[in-house]
């Protein structure tokens, strides 16, 4: 799996079909930046991966809390 594949898979898992804008907001980057990564116009910076892991952890915690309330 390439880095772009990983980014797409995680973006979709976190935010659904329209994942690019919400992911960009969470990372504090422009939507265009995410699109450039996907097109391989610019490399995905190494610091993005730990930031994505932290975003996934926060969203997982929110989901678990919501699930527990059911």
Task: Indicate residue ranges for each PLM-predicted region.
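Coiled-coil-like amphipathic alpha-helices with heptad-repeat character
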Residues: 1-3, 27-31, 54
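Short alpha-helical DNA-recognition segment
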Residues: 17-35
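A short, Lys/Arg-rich alpha-helix, primarily the initiator
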Residues: 1-16, 50
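Residue-level detection of beta-strand scaffold positions
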Residues: 9-10, 14, 21, 38, ...
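Short, basic-rich loop-to-helix N-cap that marks the start of a DNA-contacting helix
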Residues: 40-54
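Short, charged recognition helix plus adjacent turn
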Residues: 60-70
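A general structural motif at alpha-helix termini
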Residues: 27, 38, 52-53, 67
